């Protein structure tokens, strides 16, 4: 597990203040960033990922300042950013590019450990049987799950996701979020996820940070995420009732029709046997 510390971070673009003295710490949690478009969620994630630098303040991962892009931070985007024309397996392998540096080495020189890690990541997101299917033939939800697998191949200490289900239908969105949370749990990764769908956020989040105009409006646990707080955050918009816990349900139907056991992490596939066959090939 890992600890992310955001210490008094301000980010400005000219006269525009995108983040204003933001501070929080996350350790071993699945945390959701909430807020309207333009609230600062994406800017916050870009600062954490090292894609942009704070104007003031500091961001640290396990005590080390984040000063640039790091291979131990996995990022999942709203747009899948997958490689066209290749399989889910090959797309998952691109998560190791920081270690291999070139596409040529990705295709020809991966060791068995890296190949196995890619297949295990696909198993985590319920796509092991589809590992050799071209991602262009997959649904949007399946493609996003490949994106999660790709991030896991990096073996990250921190997992970030920027509106990962914004373009998906409700059923696919719930499935992707379920696999994302499972991935963070199985791989023991601290996660920070930005969402605008309050119901989905309330169902999956373990903690909620509300951003408005670049400032933290609230930082609360699930039981304290009230409709009043949500109305304050989104300007008194009409919201559907917050999601309730259904942790007693041990199975869900994924977007590809698979009956998935959320407790055992199994879709009925013999993981060891399948991984063994595919790695050897």
Swiss-Prot record:
Please list the residues that bind ATP. 35-42
Membrane recorded as keyword = yes
Sorted alphabetically, which keywords does the UniProt record give? ATP-binding, Cell membrane, Membrane, Nucleotide-binding, Phosphonate transport, Translocase, Transport
Q: Write down the chemical reaction(s) this protein catalyses.
A: phosphonate(out) + ATP + H2O = phosphonate(in) + ADP + phosphate + H(+)
An example Gene Ontology cellular component term from the record? plasma membrane
Transmembrane residue ranges: none
Tell me how this protein sits in the membrane: Peripheral membrane protein
CDD domains linked: ABC_PhnC_transporter (cd03256)
What domain of life?
A: Archaea
**Subunit and partners:** The complex is composed of two ATP-binding proteins (PhnC), two transmembrane proteins (PhnE) and a solute-binding protein (PhnD).
Q: Where is this region: Disordered?
A: 243-281
UniProt subcellular location: Cell membrane
Q: Name one Pfam family in it.
A: ABC_tran
Q: What class of enzyme is it?
A: translocase
Write the protein's name: Phosphonates import ATP-binding protein PhnC 2
Compositional bias (Low complexity) at which positions?
Answer: 244-255
Q: What does this protein do?
A: Part of the ABC transporter complex PhnCDE involved in phosphonates import. Responsible for energy coupling to the transport system.
